Structure formats: C-alpha cells, structure tokens
From Swiss-Prot:
It comes from Solanum aculeatissimum (Dutch eggplant). The gene is GT4A. GO terms for biological process: saponin biosynthetic process. Its EC number is 2.4.1.192. It catalyses: nuatigenin + UDP-alpha-D-glucose = nuatigenin 3-beta-D-glucopyranoside + UDP + H(+); diosgenin + UDP-alpha-D-glucose = diosgenin 3-O-beta-D-glucoside + UDP + H(+); tigogenin + UDP-alpha-D-glucose = tigogenin 3-O-beta-D-glucopyranoside + UDP + H(+); solasodine + UDP-alpha-D-glucose = solasodine 3-beta-D-glucoside + UDP + H(+). This is Nuatigenin 3-beta-glucosyltransferase.
Length: 491
C-alpha cells in the first residue's frame, strides 16, 4: 500500500496507439472514481498530451488526482520526427516500424521508472509483455489489459489448439471451421492473422511480440477485458473455463467512464467548434437517416479505394459523415468526388468526435473497420454496423457482429499484413459498398430486425455499468481482489 497508508496504488501502462490509450486511460479513471485508488499513468510526453486536459478536468470536477509520469520518446535514436510517438501518427509502414523499435528502446527506462514508483499493482496493455517480469521482481500483481472480446480470444485459442488452418489441402479462398466453440464460426484462410499462417522462419518482430504476449498472459495475476457479460455470455464462460486464468470484464469502459465523468470524448484532439458544427448539421437530418463512415486512427486506404467509397456514397440516397485522415493524399479523383459529395454529407479530415456522432438520434448506421472500441461504442449508442475489417483482430470482431446479428458485411476477405497503414489487397468496388449500405439503411424487415437487436444490446450494455450491474460488480471484485492480495503480501 502507498507510503504505509491503506490506499492501493496502481500503475497504468498504455501501448502507444490511440485506440489502446483511450480505453486504458478510461480504465484508470474508473479505478479512481469507483474505489478511490491512487492511480499513476506512465507514458511519453506526446502521448500524455492526448489526454492530460481531460484528467485536469476530472480534478476540477472534484475527482482524485491521477499522476502522469512521462519519459522522453527516443525519436532521434530511431530517426523519427519529433511528435510522432504512436502508431496512429505513423503514415507509412516505415514510420510504423520506427515507432515499434522506439517502444522496444523504452523498455529499460520504463522498468527503471517502475522500480522507482514501486506501485502495489501494474495494469499493463497486453502489448507490453515484459511488465510481467518486473511485476514478479517487485512481488506485485500484474493485470494484463486485453481490450477485446471473449469471442475473439476463444476463436484464437481454439485455432491454435486445433489448427484447422494447417491442413495441406486448404487454399487461401477455402473456408475453415473453428472447432469447439458455442457457435459455428468459419473463416477464409486469407482472413486469418499472420501469426497463425506464417511459417516460423518468416515471422517478424511483431509476430514474436504476439508470442511473448500470449506467454505473459499465463504468468499474469489476471486478465481484464473491455467487454460485458451480457454481450457474449457463452464465450465469457467458455474462455474462462479453458484459460484457467482470473478474468474480469469491466466494459463497455467508454460508456462506464462517460457516465461517471462529464467529458464524453477523452482525446483532446477534438476541435470543440468543429464538434458544434457537426452537431448542428446532424440536427437538420431525419431520425436514424445518417451513415457514419470511419475506419479508425490507423487504417489508410489508397486513393483508388477512397474513390470507390466516394462513388458508393454518391450513388446511395443516404446522408453521411465520412472521416478521412488529415494527411491522406487527396488527388484529383478524390477531390472531384468530394466536391460532388459535399451537398449530401460531411467529410471530416482528422480526428472526429465519434461518441458525440454515434449518440446523435440522426445517426442510423456506422461503417467501421471493426476495431473493438468502435464496435462497443456503436452498441452502446444502439447503432447497427456495416463491417469492413482490415487487420489485427478485426475479422474476428466481425464474427461477433455477424453471430449476434448486429450488422451487415461489405465483404472484405483479405487480412492486411502491415497494420493497415498501407493497404495492398484488391479494391472493393463501389457497387458492393453501396449494396451493403442500402441493405443496412433501408426499411426492410432484415434491417429492422438488426436495429431491434442492437437497441436491445445497448440497454444491456448500459445496465452492465450501473450500480449492481455485471461490469460494476466485476470492477468492485477486481479491486477488492488486488487489495486483498496486497494486504496479505504486506503482512
């Protein structure tokens, strides 16, 4: 306990990607609010700037202080421009590789800082597997933060266990069934992540990181998931049974934190005046008529694919908000399409206030890359999905949407190997995109059924984080468990 007091001190360590920082920092805020835990966040200067003012606002509102310790990001050592300190800022595979190496170089200074802080518990992103070793050295628990669904983890566990994808007769276009799961789950070989299908001698540094991440799970005190029991009860039960590691689900963390704190958007990059203009435009649209199109902070489609998306939006009768990268190239064709589209919708370059947009009553659909944060935020808002997975666990996340009946698919079939920074798969044509949009946004019995399911799941998500709800109780149980462990070891 901290300085001889009875206050539990938990150190939070985010991975350096915006989609990882947001839920972990929100989890840190929950610990402060929910149980009066002393919280410290360890990161770098630029990454801290993404959320520092939100933490300051929490303090102004009377909440406990969260200490933020920052280290210098080794930009010079790896040849990165100043200010690029996470993967969301990397506009090419080359820059992303340098960010990855810089994170590796930060391990020793972070270890030294952890020894200096000497917390009672480490709450670490899954992609910092070395934190389990420093936790064991300090004789404190390490909680691994796995910001993904139980279904995804169950799929991955069974693929590694049964290896149906290793059959020599399977081609990249064949479908494989994942054995042993509560539902029939099938994938094409081309949709599986590289760590499953690459030969050992072809694995890269990130594949090796995934191996270390899995190994660190079994040596951690427990795993914290950003999901809620009611979303996937069969998979929560299944995974906890086969994994035999303590697991707690405390999500949807974004809604949990926004319910307890006045600021909805965590990231400080959101321009308040731009947010107001977006809301004003949405106020003029009909109920559930707008399609929100966003592919997260990392995915960068080539010009040819952007043009096909623009054609699909132009050809449909659906008003839209489309988010594209601020530094994305805007060649003549895309500018032409943007000029045609501007009377039908909004094109936002840069970061968008996603929670604000999804919560608006005019938004009736969300075309997404199937990042887990985005799926949860859509479920909370009761907004059905058009799914377009690209990389990482996104094809597995799409299966949850499919099985739960929460959306429709564009029909992506190829998992990207380079983290979505540079798309190399075939362009999906506008007609196929338009078909998926209209299938979700029309007034057919199928789309109505999808909407009913999403709205029902939204209510369950909101109830989960109310006092006495499943995630509320899980968070309480988690903190009590760590307190009991700490008090026992300090006797």
């Amino acid at each position: 306990m901290d300085n001889g007091s009875n206050q539990l001190h938990v150190l939070f360590l985010p991975y350096f990607a915006t989609g990882h920082i947001i839920p972990l920092v929100n989890a840190a805020r929950l610990f402060v609010f929910h149980a009066g835990v002393k919280v410290t966040i360890l990161t770098t200067h630029h990454n801290a700037s993404l959320f520092r003012s939100t933490i300051d606002n929490d303090v102004e509102d009377g909440h406990s202080v969260i200490s933020i310790h920052t280290l210098r990001f080794p930009s010079t050592e790896v040849g990165l421009p100043e200010g690029i300190e996470n993967f969301s800022s990397a506009s090419s595979p080359e820059l992303a590789g340098k960010v990855f190496y810089a994170i590796y170089l930060l391990q020793k200074p972070m270890e030294d800082k952890i020894r200096e802080i000497h917390p009672d518990c480490i709450f670490s992103d899954m992609y910092l597997p070395w934190t389990v070793n420093i936790a064991l050295e300090l004789k404190i628990p390490r909680l691994l933060f796995n910001q993904s669904s139980y279904m995804y983890n169950s799929i991955l566990y069974n693929l590694r266990l049964y290896k149906p994808h290793k059959s020599k007769t399977i081609t990249s276009t064949d479908s494989i069934s994942v054995p042993g799961l509560p539902d029939k789950i099938e994938f094409k070989l081309s949709q599986l992540t590289d760590d499953l299908i690459k030969p050992e001698d072809e694995k890269n540094a990130f594949d090796e990181l995934l191996d270390r991440t899995r190994e660190s799970e079994d040596r951690s005190y427990g795993i914290v998931h950003d999901t809620f029991y009611e979303l996937e009860p069969a998979y929560a039960d299944y995974y906890q049974k086969v994994k035999k590691t303590k697991c707690w689900q405390i999500g949807p963390i974004s809604h949990f934190s926004s319910k307890l704190f006045r600021r909805k958007e965590l990231i400080n990059a959101v321009d308040e005046s731009n947010s107001c203009a977006i809301v004003e435009w949405l106020n003029e649209q009909e109920h559930k008529s707008v399609l929100y199109v966003s592919f997260g902070s990392v995915v960068r489609f080539p010009e040819a694919q952007l043009t096909e998306i623009a054609k699909a939006l132009e050809a449909s009768s659906i008003p839209f908000i489309w988010v594209v990268k601020k530094d994305q190239s805007a060649e003549t064709t895309c500018l032409l399409e943007e000029e045609k589209l501007k009377n039908k919708g909004l094109i936002i370059r840069g970061w968008a206030p996603q929670l604000t947009i999804l919560d608006h009553s005019a938004v009736g659909g969300f075309m997404t890359h199937c990042g887990w944060n985005s799926i949860l935020e859509a479920i909370i808002a009761g907004v059905p999905l058009v799914t377009w997975p690209v990389f990482a666990e996104q094809f597995y996340n799409e299966k949850l949407v499919e099985v739960m009946g929460l959306g429709v698919k564009v029909g992506a079939e190829v998992h990207e190997s380079n983290g979505g920074v540079e798309i190399s798969s075939l362009v999906i044509e506008s007609e196929k995109i338009k078909e998926a949009i209209e299938k979700l946004m029309d007034d057919s019995k199928e789309s109505q059924k999808i909407r009913e399911k999403v709205i029902g799941m939204s209510e369950m998500a909101k109830n989960a984080v109310e006092e006495g709800g499943s995630s509320w109780n899980n968070l309480t149980a988690l903190i009590d468990d760590i307190k009991n462990f700490t008090s026992t070891t300090n006797v």
